[in-house]
Amino acid sequence: MTVDAAGAGAESDVAETEGEIALFAALASLFPGMPIRRDADFFTDLGGHSFFAARLASALRVNPRFAQITVRDIYQQRRIGAIAEVLDQAPQEMAAPVDWTPPSAWRRWRCGVAQALALPVMVSLRMTQWLAPFFTYHLLTGSPDDSVALATLASISVFLIATVLQFFIAWAAKWLIVGRLKPGIYPLWGVTYFRWWAADRMVESAPTYLLSGSSLYPLWLRALGAKIGEEVIIGGATVRAHDLLEIGDGVSVGNGVSFENARVERGQLHLGRIALQDNACVGSYVIMEGNTAIGPWGHLEAQSAMADGREVPAGRIWQGSPARDVGAFDTLGQPARPVTSPARLRAEKLFFVFGVLLVATLFFIPVFPTFFLIDWFDTQNVLPWFEGSGPLGQLACYFLLAFPASAVLIVATVLASAALRWIVFPRLKPGRYAVHSNTYCAKWLISQIQEASLNVLSGIYATVYSPFWYRLLGAKVGRDAEISSAQGVIPDMLTLGDETFIADAVMLGDERIDGGWMTMQPTVVSHRSFVGNGGYIADGTVLPENVLIGVHSCAPHNSKVADGDTWLGSPPIHLPAREQVSGAPESLTFKPSPLRRLARGLVEGVRIVTPHAVVIAVGYTVMLDLMPLADQERWGAVLAYLAVIGMAYSVGNFLLIAALKWLVMGRYRKRADPMWTPFVWLSEGITSLYEGMAAPNFMRYLRGTPWLPLAFNLLGCKIGRGVYMDTTDITEFDCVSIGADSELNAGACPQTHLFEDRVMKIDHVSIGERVYMGPRSAVLYSAVVGNDAHLGPLTLVMKGEHIPACSRWAGCPAAPDKA
């Protein structure tokens, strides 16, 4: 059978095979009136780009025969005839969908009620950490003769004790609630699930980021039940089932690693073992599901994903999403592990203990100038019209007083952190260093300052103020650079050119640790280059000008990148062309007027200060009611009051953000706005307040409960019944639609906006019913995921892409999963 491509004209080739017929028809609708030839290049001849490639793949998938065509196929083949050959070689039969029965509403809500009863305890314990030093300071400064210096020292001591107690409480809760977990498959919303969930929430509450990269971290994991060998270095990891993690001697684990050995799929909790054998190496931003292993000297490279049941053989290197063998590891080329004396190891442990307490104190001390300033405002009766008002009036009064005081707190914290960094440590230099060296210890403390700032000063990121913060820490940051919440940054090694853009959660130039050695190399992102959300930029990377690294993508080797390139995926593939937004004037993207700079600075200043002002205002208001109970030594009443206030504060944060979202933004709809416009500032402000207030104080406790979808629906999402959500990573809420009984695991993200070309583009994400999203999988805007689809870990669904119903996909970008 031969047919002419519809509407393509006489210059088109005649489609002959089944693949050509489908391809020519799809191309004719994408490029009406253009000749369709077998030797034509989709990008250079037809003018295709990344968005059109996704649309073409989606159009072809309408035919079940071609449901497994991928965007990567189009990028790699390019020529129309070659793409048609891929279609003709497609398998004739698709895998049959797996039938499963979602848990009943009775089981779900029975567990939900039990979870709701546990929430006040969890929230109150978090509240105690910052209310206890508040209480101590005001208890000891109630009389004119009291010593402010003594009250300050006592408050710091109580804060540090509360910080240490958080670890102890998390440890005790884990063993009391769940004991030792065993691998297996358990019903979702059952007893084992509830116990795992409660223990996971309690362990998550401990500030483990303070231990990252230190020799204290393995001790903490052992205390929680993991089997950890000697000479193990762990940069930073999330572990979902500690009892099922086994790490051998000499293992190195990078930053931002996710050991997702507990996940929910098809109405069941899957608990599996993860084993890293002696001298294995796990790169940064790796995801490992349960029932996975890495053999001796095996290497799993950064930004890779290992799905359930996979294993890296001894001495092999695996890379990518999904991870595949890329060669042998040269053990002979690995330098010998440096010998370290027991005395040095003991001294390092003491240094890390001191460093943890120092960093914790550093980010707490600036609260005292805030106390002094508010107390002075109070004695001067600055706001007399609030005198004699009730609790709400007191709260409003202290919020207004706390606003300028919180600005002082933030500035003092930034300056104190920078001062410590420069007074104590010189500028780090590139090179290879032993992990048991003074250079490593210096790098660790500098990294801890930056990492702690992500938790304490999170509002600064993605604002006009973030470049100044990085410069204070030692990074070289060009004019008009935009930097969001980058991770793993070694400031002395980082250079960002003018007008660069670093999106959320980018792992940016972190050190590489392997075999007892740490390597640091300069990382450069040049003029107007862009790194997308969740991207990985290895240390030593030099990105030329105008380069774009896509969402969840790795930067390729320096020798492969040229000016203006676009790279996507893990491993990365080169995109010959991408969709670009034109028409926005540079005055709204790269060259704003002084007035716009001032306006944005004011809006972002308010968003930075507000979370701290709310905390301080609530703290002062609570103290007014709490002090009389303490004076009467009614300690039982004090604890009960704290429990009630803790839950009220948590829910209040959520209700405040929900009200602000509807009042300020209304309902999100599809749109595109240049970065230097009020809509973008306000939208990003709501997102920042959500991530800084509602998410940590309320939403994160609802992860894994039937209450989280209801909370998101109040914010504007459309989430069906029975949806399981272990993620809070949603921003433009009204643009998210999730069908009934779908399962979104940890870090899964329906991403409703992108900032390419400094234009904020927002559109809908539609996820069907009974869809499974694995850990850190992402669906970009304008994409549709069909019913019963399965997305593996670290899978990226491109914007405009359509994932067929009842199909399995894995990879970055998504490709058919043969599992």
Description of each model-found segment:
Residues 81, 94-225, 314-474, 559-716, ...:
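Terminal amphipathic alpha-helical/low-complexity segments used for targeting or macromolecular assembly
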Residues 35-36, 67, 213, 281, ...:
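N-terminal alpha-helical segment
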Residues 15-16, 209, 273, 458, ...:
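Residue-level marker of regulatory loop/turn positions in helix-turn-helix DNA-binding domains and
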Residues 34-36, 68, 91, 144, ...:
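Secondary-structure boundary/capping signal
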Residues 12-16, 72-76, 106, 210, ...:
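Alpha-helix initiation/capping motif
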